[in-house]
Amino acid sequence: MPQQSPTPTLRERRKLATRADLVESTLQIVREDGAEAVSVERIARESGMARATLYAHFPDGRDAIVRAAYAELGEQLVTNTEAGIDAAKDWRAQLLAVADAMIELAAQPHLGYFYNVAGPALIPDGEGRGGGSGASIRIITEVLQEAMAAGQVASGTDAVATATLLVGSLRSVGIAVASDAGAAPAMRAAFVRLCAGLRS
């Protein structure tokens, strides 16, 4: 029987809540004015917390909290993707749900640019980097494997390699839509055509 994780203490819960509030304040600044507007002073002002509190949770200051905000966006993307997968009726709709989650995020002013363009440049590695892509590869791989087992996707398809290529294309979709939200319909249609080639 697996061991249950110990229940967090009140102090630990408060610490997590404070950290979450700081990250959300950072994301709100990005939503309003873009990543370049994020500073320790503004985060402290927006969150109503002292600079010392911010540094207690993020000793590296702005860089650390920007990484945490980027990681949080990646987690939100995965959550939205999984919700779309659960609501989809077949494998093609499931793959499209992955694309739609990315397009929805990318189309948000400032936030989409932060996740797809500015963030990766600011965060070459470390916390949050690649989390959304890794989860998307896993999700698409599972979708393809199930579709292959049902005879709906061509046998012999390398699910992992195909998932990796599809996620790579979605990164390009995210960059394009973040730069021009008007590109979303054409990008979505192109992804649908790309996935259609996988049918058995």
Q: Where would I find each of the regions flagged by the language model?
A:
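Secondary-structure edge/capping motif, primarily at the C-terminal ends of alpha-helices
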Residues: G84-I85, Y113-V117, V173, V177-D180
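Hydrophobic alpha-helical connector segments
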Residues: T79-Q108, A159-L166, R188
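C-terminal peripheral helix-coil segments that are non-catalytic and often amphipathic
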Residues: M1-P6, E104, R138-A150, S169, ...
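Amphipathic, non-transmembrane alpha-helical scaffold segments
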Residues: K15, R19, V66, Y70, ...
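Amphipathic alpha-helical segments used for helix-helix packing
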Residues: E104-D125
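Conserved hydrophobic residue
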Residues: V153-A154
